[in-house]
């Protein structure tokens, strides 16, 4: 088995109301920053052992689908890196 870290980033789909991002965007604009858009996201770092990076990614995808993200309102990305 190899040690991996899977990073799952969960964000609201475009078009879903994101009050946290809206408030943050307004505050940044008041501070003089120019933005086109801002979205908030949650990031989960999962340490796990697996035979291959693909196996680790598959397990992280299952975690995202079953608990970390609601597929109706969320998009998510999974990245896997070998731990040293």
Segments and roles (model prediction):
Residues 1-84:
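Long, contiguous binding/interaction regions
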């Amino acid at each position: 088995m190899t040690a991996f870290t899977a990073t799952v980033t969960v964000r609201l789909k475009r078009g879903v109301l994101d009050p946290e991002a809206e408030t943050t965007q307004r505050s940044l604009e008041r501070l003089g920053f120019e933005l086109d858009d801002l979205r908030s996201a949650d990031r989960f770092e999962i340490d796990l052992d697996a035979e291959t990076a693909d196996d680790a990614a598959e397990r992280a995808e299952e975690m995202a689908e079953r608990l970390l993200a609601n597929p109706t309102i969320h998009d998510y990305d999974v990245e896997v890196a070998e731990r040293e």
